């Protein structure tokens, strides 16, 4: 199976299935000398861990990470960093019934068509549990970005029809409520909404928003490797994501040029923007303003509602999906969005080191010898 490797210079290779022995990742390209511990990784993994509230799957997993290589005496060595998280509470018997049919909204059918075989126990590689590896690698990328003054804040912007009010935005609320919303009032409304959805044996979609500050101007490559194009690929690669926006996103289709353009001004000796409709990029290159991206997540497809599908014999049948499932994925997925943004940014930041000859000379302490 191709498609499990991401990045050029900061390169991650993920492996494992939801109901296998574990999931893991190998990170290649992390510079030597970064202070790194398992606890640095665990902080991020705890944010996506299941079983933390009534709005997540009741499957209980400690999701304890173990660093197998690439770290010595508390610092990265510059060699590949291998990490693993073992699975302990998988109940594959919950999925034996679905071996003979395709679950609506899942990748069962497409995996079967492509490979002629599928791991029906929780979806295999298409399971959300695959994102553990992304988060572990993203934790390292985020720590590297902090060395350059780049910070990432990700939270739940909307759950179903309930959206946060930026007038009540409080980043401290993100860790206080079960839905990772920076608005206590909206979080309370969203809980009521989710309770009604769950009583109807249904699930809800939602939206995550990610703000990246401290990104210097000049990150990203023109044409096919634009910063926003890479971010879009990274975010949409997350299993349940069906939409991506940067800046004003889809709203630009209804705007006029005088509304949409961000004016420039000199501020403290540098070029700054008067607004940020573009979301931090111009021409696929960072412009120094905060990156503002959003990801739309579909409702969890595993629901107790009766749904139409077909079995492997080609017969039409009706099914309802039993098992342990999230009624909404966004609160646990915000850290996955954060991880993929971090992986994209650190990779492009490293790539940008080769963009200018004068900067390469400066790095190596070489004087210019000829024009």
Locations of regions flagged by a protein language model:
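N-terminal, positively charged regions that mediate nucleic acid binding
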Residues: 1-59
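Glycine-rich anion/phosphate-binding loop at the beta-strand->alpha-helix junction
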Residues: 21, 201-316
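Glycine-rich, N-terminal phosphate-binding loop and its surrounding beta-alpha-beta segment
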Residues: 45-104, 108
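Glycine-rich, mobile lid/loop segments that gate access to catalytic sites or pores
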Residues: 113-223
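A short glycine/serine-rich beta->alpha loop
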Residues: 11-14, 119-130, 217-221, 276-281, ...
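Internal helix-turn-beta structural module
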Residues: 302-371
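Alpha-helical support elements that line or immediately flank enzyme active sites
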Residues: 21-33, 129-150, 225, 229-233, ...
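Short acidic, glycine/tyrosine-flanked loop/strand segments centered on an H-E-D-like triad
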Residues: 99-124, 307-325
């Amino acid at each position: 199976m191709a498609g499990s490797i991401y990045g050029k210079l900061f390169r991650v290779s993920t492996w494992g299935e939801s109901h296998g022995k574990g999931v893991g990742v190998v990170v290649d390209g992390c510079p030597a000398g970064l202070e790194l511990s398992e606890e640095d990784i665990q902080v991020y993994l705890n944010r996506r861990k299941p079983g933390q509230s009534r709005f997540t799957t009741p499957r209980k997993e400690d999701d304890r990470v173990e660093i197998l290589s690439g770290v010595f005496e508390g610092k990265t060595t510059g060699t590949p960093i291998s990490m693993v998280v073992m699975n302990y509470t998988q109940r594959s018997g919950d999925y034996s019934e679905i071996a003979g049919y395709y679950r609506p909204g899942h990748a069962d059918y497409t995996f079967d068509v492509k490979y002629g075989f599928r791991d029906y126990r929780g979806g295999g590689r298409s399971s959300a549990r695959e994102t553990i590896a992304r988060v572990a690698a993203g934790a390292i990328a985020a720590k590297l970005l902090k060395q350059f003054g780049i910070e990432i804040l990700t939270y739940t912007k909307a759950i179903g029809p309930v959206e946060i009010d930026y007038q009540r935005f409080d980043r401290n609320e993100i860790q206080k409520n079960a839905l990772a919303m920076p608005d206590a009032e909206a979080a309370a409304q969203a809980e009521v909404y989710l309770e009604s959805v769950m009583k109807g044996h249904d699930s809800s979609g939602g939206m995550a928003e990610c703000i990246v500050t401290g990104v210097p101007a000049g990150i990203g490559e023109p044409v096919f490797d634009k910063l926003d194009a890479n971010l879009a690929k990274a975010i949409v690669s997350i299993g349940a994501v069906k939409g991506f926006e940067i800046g004003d996103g889809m709203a630009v289709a209804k705007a006029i040029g005088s509304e949409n353009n961000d004016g420039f001004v000199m501020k403290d000796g540098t070029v700054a923007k008067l607004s940020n409709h573009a979301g931090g990029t111009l021409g696929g290159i960072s412009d120094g303003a905060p990156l503002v991206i959003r990801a739309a997540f579909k409702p969890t497809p595993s629901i107790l509602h009766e749904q139409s599908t077909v079995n492997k014999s080609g017969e039409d049948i009706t099914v309802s999906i039993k098992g342990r499932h999230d009624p909404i994925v966004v609160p646990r997925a915000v850290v996955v969005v954060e991880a993929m943004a971090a992986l994209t940014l650190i990779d492009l930041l490293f790539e940008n080191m080769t963009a200018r000859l004068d900067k390469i000379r400066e790095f190596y302490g070489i004087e210019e010898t000829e024009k």
